[in-house]
């Protein structure tokens, strides 16, 4: 299945959102930190660089420079997806995805997770979203994913060889980058297929490590 032909409904918003990998990472981080660390949001450039380069809760792990992050912010600002907030001590950045693309909070959170971690199963999204949005159950989460798909902002990814569960991915990035991610996942082990409980514990521990990394970064 072609990524570009996956949506049954054309979305003018989606057509304008062909982001490069750095822009995808920056936008995903702003969405995540608004939900998990509202006391430090909007983010300074330095805080955003740290968020982009986290070793946990990121796939792939990246090493972006302040210059790359700043350039991505300005490009996103030009699309109406970010905004600079002037401050007395430091300038900060916030995302505008909810307004620019007209998404409800649940859809914003799911979009952020897909931007940060690529193709994911419903169970993975349910576990990883628990600190950011209270989905009642998997059916409610699937309903919001289907609304994103109808807008041309996400898709049900083709199931790869050896995978038992369907995966969803965003459609905001470059189609070639998304195809590359899907190809890489074809050779990756399906972690939660054999032991879902262990997979959930792993994701919870990963979230705790990410929170500790953020605290340490603020102390430095």
UniProtKB/Swiss-Prot annotation:
It comes from the Bacteria. Pfam families: DUF480 (PF04337). This is UPF0502 protein PSPPH_2577. It comes from Pseudomonas savastanoi pv. phaseolicola (strain 1448A / Race 6). Coiled coil: none annotated. Gene3D superfamilies: Winged helix-like DNA-binding domain superfamily/Winged helix DNA-binding domain. Belongs to the UPF0502 family.
């Amino acid at each position: 299945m072609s990524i570009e032909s996956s949506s049954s409904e054309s979305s003018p918003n989606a057509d304008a959102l062909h982001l490069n990998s750095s822009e995808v990472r920056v936008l995903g981080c702003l969405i995540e930190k608004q939900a998990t660390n509202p006391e430090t949001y909007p983010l300074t450039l330095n805080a955003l660089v740290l968020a982009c380069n986290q070793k946990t809760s990121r796939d792939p792990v990246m090493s972006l420079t302040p210059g790359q992050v700043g350039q991505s912010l300005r490009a996103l600002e030009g699309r109406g997806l970010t905004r600079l907030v002037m401050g007395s001590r430091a300038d900060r950045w916030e995302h505008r995805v909810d307004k620019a693309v007209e998404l409800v909070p649940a859809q914003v959170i799911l979009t952020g997770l897909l931007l940060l971690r690529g193709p994911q199963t419903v169970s993975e999204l349910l576990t990883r979203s628990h600190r950011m949005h209270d989905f009642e159950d998997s059916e409610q989460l699937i309903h919001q994913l289907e609304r994103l798909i109808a807008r041309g902002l996400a898709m049900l990814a083709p199931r790869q060889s050896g995978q038992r569960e369907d995966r969803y991915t965003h459609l905001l990035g470059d189609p070639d980058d998304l195809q590359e991610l899907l190809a890489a996942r074809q050779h990756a082990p399906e972690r939660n297929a054999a032991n879902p409980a262990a997979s959930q514990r792993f994701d919870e521990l990963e979230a705790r490590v990410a929170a500790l990394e953020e605290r340490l970064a603020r102390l430095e």
